[in-house]
């Protein structure tokens, strides 16, 4: 891949994840402190991206493959999304805010798959080249958090408006990207185009079924972290919470490099279990940490994000890639994404909000406080149950396998 093309794709990835990272992390803090939304309302708002993740395979797959050039579709989605996000930042009524944010998520979430597919189309060797491009997305998320923390604007609408402006900028930039026309011919939208019936046959394999069930279940407590970590840290007085939370993405980059070694030493099952164990330890650390002598527990809970994500989700992506026949790999990955980031996190958004509302203390002067230890022990217990069930139920003959092909293209979490 030529240097010029590498730079163009890297800028695209940086902007793609800067947009998401600049508003999503601090959303709960703004909604809770300034708009006084309930925990359940905050959870539902954070869960709009899960709805987008469930529907994005239809939008991203068929529209780009059959009807529109990818760069033009990206420009349209980001342009419309920027307008919607700005409008959402001006609303104070939950009903209207939620509806607009949901529409925005339906525009944004497909763009992650579209930026990946556009990159693949312009690479000579995607397996070797994609990783070095995709890492700029994580860098964009990190820079977004550092900027918001530095500006001290977490409990305001500024992060969302900055994301809206960045989205419009991204729309303009997408029009400069290399032409990526559709490869197929127009056809009607059908579920079988996205999830072929053959992909369901993977569930006949007991090990795959257990893995899929565990992936779904672990994503339910996952939403506690994404929706309520920033409000939690701000409520207990941690300064520059958004900036400090970027340590999680920094550790993610480091632990990504360690995955091949752990595969060789532990195999797939124990690597997956280590990832789930990290979730248990993280939530326990949040439950018992504080902004005083035990502040190190909070930092531990943030830094362990690299293990939480890489050792379960990236490992899981590689496992699916190895289990599925070549013709079904894309469909299988889409199915797992639907199960995890779609259905699992959608349920998690509802449950996390309900739990947070259960442990609201009496408010004074309009300031709402929470019994955070009780809140964090719920996802800790849930993650522990999933870990135990997975340990007892997962049996796979392919205990160890090479990661040379799959780790290059595994997307990083934010």
Name what the model sees in each region.
Residues 2-50, 207-245, 313, 349:
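Helix-loop boundary and gating motifs at the non-cytosolic
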Residues 55-69, 151-153, 254-268, 356-357:
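Helix-to-loop junctions at the C-terminal end of transmembrane segments
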Residues 150-166, 354-383:
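A membrane-interface helix-boundary motif in multi-pass transporters
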């Amino acid at each position: 891949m030529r240097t010029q093309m590498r730079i163009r794709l890297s800028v695209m990835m940086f902007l793609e994840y800067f947009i998401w990272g600049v508003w999503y992390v601090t959303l709960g803090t703004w909604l809770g402190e300034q708009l006084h939304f309930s925990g359940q309302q905050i959870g539902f708002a954070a869960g709009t991206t899960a709805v987008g993740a469930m529907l994005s395979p239809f939008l991203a797959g068929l529209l780009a493959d059959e009807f529109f050039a990818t760069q033009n579709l990206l420009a349209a989605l980001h342009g419309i999304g920027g307008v919607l996000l700005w409008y959402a930042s001006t609303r104070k009524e939950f009903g209207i805010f939620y509806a607009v944010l949901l529409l925005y998520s339906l525009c944004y979430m497909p763009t992650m798959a579209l930026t990946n597919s556009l990159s693949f189309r312009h690479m000579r060797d995607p397996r070797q080249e994609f990783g070095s491009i995709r890492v700029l997305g994580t860098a964009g998320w990190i820079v977004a958090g550092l900027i918001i923390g530095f500006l001290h604007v977490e409990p305001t609408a500024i992060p969302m408006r900055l994301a809206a402006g960045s989205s419009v900028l991204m729309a303009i930039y997408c029009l400069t990207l290399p032409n990526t026309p559709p490869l197929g011919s127009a056809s009607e939208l059908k579920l079988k185009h996205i999830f072929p019936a053959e992909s369901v046959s993977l569930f006949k394999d007991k090990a795959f079924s257990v893995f899929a069930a565990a992936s779904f279940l672990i994503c339910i407590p996952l939403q506690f972290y994404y929706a309520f970590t920033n409000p939690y840290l701000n409520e207990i007085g941690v300064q520059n919470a958004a900036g400090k939370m970027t340590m999680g993405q920094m550790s993610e980059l480091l632990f990504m490099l360690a995955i091949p070694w752990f595969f060789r030493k532990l195999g797939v099952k124990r690597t997956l279990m280590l990832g789930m164990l990290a979730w248990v330890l993280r939530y326990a650390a949040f439950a018992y940490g504080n902004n005083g002598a035990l502040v190190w527990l909070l930092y531990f809970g943030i830094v362990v994000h690299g293990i939480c994500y890489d050792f379960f989700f990236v490992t899981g992506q590689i496992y699916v890639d190895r289990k599925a026949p070549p013709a079904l790999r894309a469909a299988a990955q889409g199915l797992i994404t639907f199960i995890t980031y779609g259905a699992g996190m959608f349920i998690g958004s509802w449950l996390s909000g309900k739990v947070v509302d259960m442990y609201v203390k009496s408010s004074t002067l309009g300031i709402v406080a929470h019994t955070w230890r009780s809140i964090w022990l719920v996802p800790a217990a849930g993650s522990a149950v999933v870990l135990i069930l997975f340990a007892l139920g997962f049996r796979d003959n392919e205990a160890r396998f090479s990661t040379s092909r799959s780790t290059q293209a595994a997307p990083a979490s934010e």
